[in-house]
Amino acid sequence: MTEPFEGRVALVTGAGRGIGRAVALELSAGGAQVALLARSLSQLDEAAEAVRAHGGNAVVLQADVGDPTAVAEAAAQAEKELGPVDILINNAATVQPMGPTVTAPSAAWASAFAVNVDAPFHFAQAVLPSMLDRGWGRIVNVSSGIAAHPGAMVGMNAYAATKSALEAHTVNLAAELAGSGVTVNVYRPGSVDTAMQGWIRSQPPEEIGAVLHEHFRVSYEEGSLITPKHSARSMLAQLLRDETGEIWTVGDA
């Protein structure tokens, strides 16, 4: 029986841990060769070893997605080592700055857009030419439920703004590429038990806002968070469909 991603090359950003790592492992289990990209080399090496331990093929790309030059170089390296990218999962993200907007550093705000919005754009630019030449490609931009309800989590203005912008970019790009064989979709992964969630819970309530801190604390203590593997499988169950410009959620699969 042929695996669903047999013969495909996938590039996953934010692949060192959490959802990105889980997606990379599931793609590999489905037959894909995977390029793992993140900032932490130690996390990337561990993720790559996990892929190889199950018979998969992985290459490690250490890069800061907020740097357009690094993005272009990483995408080129992925193609050099594995071949043209068929599947792009833009998962890397930052939740900072958090807390009152009036005290948010301008540099941190700009960095949030560089990582959460600009990087997916630059990665798409890098891989689209070969996808369009071959008439097949899959791009998934990982968003958040905050884009559906931007006012729901006070204290996360930058995250709400960037994820909303990412979804608009995704849907518009999908319309631009309609009929090309390349699909572009949004994935809202649900509330997942990740290091990012743990970091938020570790922050002083007075710095990020007591209500926001309580939201994340209660979600964790009530056991309502899902595993990265659960979320990854939900995403990939929808990946090979021909629909484009959609907003997937963890419950759609």
Segments and roles (model prediction):
Residues 9, 16-17:
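Conserved glycine-rich cofactor-binding loop
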Residues 32-46:
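Conserved glycine-rich Rossmann-like NAD(P)H-binding loop of the short-chain dehydrogenase/reductase
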Residues 42, 62-73, 106:
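The beta1-alpha1 cofactor-binding region of Rossmann-like NAD(H)/NADP(H)-dependent oxidoreductases
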Residues 99-101, 108-110:
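Substrate-binding pocket helix/loop in short-chain dehydrogenase/reductase
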Residues 124-125, 171:
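A short, exposed helix-loop element centered on a Lys and neighboring polar residues
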Residues 140-165, 170-171, 175-179, 191:
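Catalytic loop of short-chain dehydrogenase/reductase
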Residues 179-182, 186, 194, 205-253:
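C-terminal helical subdomain
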